Amino acid sequence: MSEPTTTPVVGNSASGDSAEQHDLGQKRGKGGNWNRPRGDHQAKKQKMDRRGDRQREQEKQGEGRDTRRKTDGPLVADEVRQPKRKVACMIGYCGTGYHGMQLNPPQKTIEGDIFQAFVKAGAISQNNADDPKKSAFMRAARTDKGVHAAGNVISLKMIIEDENIVEKINSHLPEQLRVWGVSRTNKAFECRKLCSSRVYEYLMPTYSFLNPRPGTVMSEKLLKDGTSPDEEGKKYWESVAADLESQGVSYDEWMKRACIDEIKGEETKEVAESEVKTDSKTDAATLEKIKAVERRHREEFRISGERLAKIREILKIYEGTHNFHNFTLGKAFKDPSAMRTMKSLTCSDPFLIDGTEWVSIKIHGQSFMLHQIRKMISMVALSVRCNADPQKLIPQTFEKARINIPKAPALGLLLERPVYDSYNKKLQGEFGREGVHFDNWNDQIEAFKHKFIYDKIYAEEKGQHVFHAFFSFVDVFTGDASFDFLLKQGITKECTTDYMNKKAKEEGKEIKKLEEDDDEVANEQNEG
């Protein structure tokens, strides 16, 4: 693009004006401005005359026409204007069936449904119904496709004269999307910018922390590296082998066919079926028997106190301010925005849901980048499964070397709530208002979480075995040295992305991508 001209313009920029100014003998004064003799109003008068002529011509041409400013939606001339107040709107939702939080026509999104409900309930006037920006519409945290939120916040200017406005809004929403309440704020409130921190929850079955299955690529690498399964993992896999043998499936047959189902699965597209040696006449009945036995043992697994303590130990290493460039996409080590502060990370005691044991991990941080939470969870689980040294490995991920950390399934992730500690102190102190929080609706939120979020997560895992497919993919991956950082030496040059990409290029091989940023879109907050 060429540079714009720097010639100053006074009045109309037509060439006639320039010639007239030249005739008047105007010259540039200090600062490059044009000097016009005081008292000479001829140029100004001509300019005003021309402006009047244009205005009269436009009025003449516009007779009988609606000359109001055009918008995407109709202007409602007879709509009674009602006062709008700046508010924080507390919401919760199950993200199943939605293409994320953020408005993204023509896709079905949380914001799209909520905004339409606001309009139908009269919380937003018809004249402002065509564009959320007219109401200063903003979200505290954007969640991606399929991700849930027990609590999220929207700030906007809204009509709240009706004391039943929340009930009216909810009457226009599906059951999986709720408005908990509305709180008055000051005019300058912006829910994203004034959010002090955010709390996320990640649910996962405890069998996710088991050692890799014997005979898999990862298991063989660990054995060669001198890392044996822990006692709990050893006993678990021995019991699976004994159960299979009692049903006529030998250990060798199990090893031969163990990876076939995962290789065919959608979660493991990176591994070609030809990479596993198996007979062309694979016994489908035997495969089904193996899957059924493994599934039953996963459901019956109960995590030990020792393994649970290790999970909690690793989570604590994340606390504080660190460079999380390895836990997102496309973020350079030197990028200041890669520095993030984690306030606390905790793991619940295990609990049973429909016979399967689960744990809940809570992550409280100031802000998060794209995929960050899912990659953090993945690193915790992989470290436990492979008996890695977390005190060595996790700090290495905060350093310059770039590695591929696979992201754990989106299934278990939900936004619990944004936190407004600093803003609430100011709001209560200066304005005497209650503040922005979810305390008034705790019972409703808990009931909603169990019915519309937790139960859907549990049911999807039981039916589709999402976590099993993810960790099986890691166990059978043969593409390159991507996961060799889980061995005793930790992160070495050979398992960095720069080294592997350079080597693949030199050998004329296709560079394998472990993940694509296909279902999530980078955004202004980069949440989750």
Curated annotation (Swiss-Prot):
This is tRNA pseudouridine synthase 1. It comes from the Eukaryota. It is found in: Nucleus. It is an enzyme of class 5 (isomerase). Keywords: Isomerase, Metal-binding, mRNA processing, Nucleus, tRNA processing, Zinc. The keyword Methyltransferase does not apply. The gene is PUS1. It comes from Yarrowia lipolytica (strain CLIB 122 / E 150) (Yeast). Binds 1 zinc ion per subunit. Pfam families: PseudoU_synth_1 (PF01416). Its cofactor is Zn(2+). SUPFAM superfamilies: Pseudouridine synthase (SSF55120). InterPro entries: PsdUridine_synth_cat_dom_sf, PsdUridine_synth_TruA, PsdUridine_synth_TruA_a/b_dom, PsdUridine_synth_TruA_C, PUS1/PUS2-like, TruA/RsuA/RluB/E/F_N. Belongs to the tRNA pseudouridine synthase TruA family. GO terms for biological process: mRNA processing; mRNA pseudouridine synthesis; snRNA pseudouridine synthesis; tRNA pseudouridine synthesis. Residues 1-80, 505-528 are annotated as: Disordered. Its EC number is 5.4.99.-. Residues 1-18 have a biased composition (Polar residues). Formation of pseudouridine at positions 27 and 28 in the anticodon stem and loop of transfer RNAs; at positions 34 and 36 of intron-containing precursor tRNA(Ile) and at position 35 in the intron-containing tRNA(Tyr). Catalyzes pseudouridylation at position 44 in U2 snRNA. Also catalyzes pseudouridylation of mRNAs. Residues 49-80, 505-515 have a biased composition (Basic and acidic residues).
